């Protein structure tokens, strides 16, 4: 399940067939919520590397059909910076995916500035996706209807209010599920 929606089985062949049927030239692959950081920095670093290497192989096997956004290790900022460098320099990532909020902090929090600076130096594409909800969702209202929209919108607003967009103008941002 992804935010209350049953997800279909995925394979490269099925994805390419869907792209062809829909008239879509290529797709960008990434993983989203909950990401790879489940409480342990070292395990998150290991998981991010495994995920990114596997997705890079998919792209290598189908370079005209797939690109990828690298998975990082926030709230582990040092690990995220290291994995971003690895993903761009060795694996050929097209960008990174960041969760709008992690461990109670939203993008725009000064704690994430070192990562934003590193990504800004590369003029990186930063795809922002809703994070795990900080509190319970509204009963009878699926998370994807309102909560996800609010999560990415809050991240975008905090990034603007806290000067992230001014300090790091070369970040190429895309917000998923925002208003």
Roles of regions detected by a PLM:
Residues 1-179:
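Helix-coil boundary/capping segments in enzymes
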């Amino acid at each position: 399940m992804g935010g209350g929606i049953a997800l279909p089985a995925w394979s490269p062949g099925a994805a390419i067939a869907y792209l062809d049927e829909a008239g879509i030239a290529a797709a960008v692959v990434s993983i989203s919520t909950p990401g790879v950081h489940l409480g342990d920095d070292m395990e998150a670093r290991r998981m991010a590397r495994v995920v990114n290497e596997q997705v890079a192989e998919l792209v290598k096997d189908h370079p005209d059909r797939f690109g990828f956004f690298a998975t990082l290790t926030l709230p582990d900022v040092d690990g995220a910076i290291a994995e971003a460098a690895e993903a761009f320099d060795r694996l050929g990532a097209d960008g990174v995916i960041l969760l709008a909020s992690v461990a109670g902090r939203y993008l725009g929090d000064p704690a994430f500035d070192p990562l934003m600076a590193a990504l800004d130096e590369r003029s990186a594409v930063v795809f922002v996706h809703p994070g795990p909800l900080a509190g319970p969702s509204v009963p009878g209202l699926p998370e994807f209807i309102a909560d996800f929209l609010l999560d990415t919108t809050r991240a975008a607003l905090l990034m603007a209010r806290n000067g992230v967009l001014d300090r790091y103008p070369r970040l190429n941002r895309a917000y998923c599920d925002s208003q």
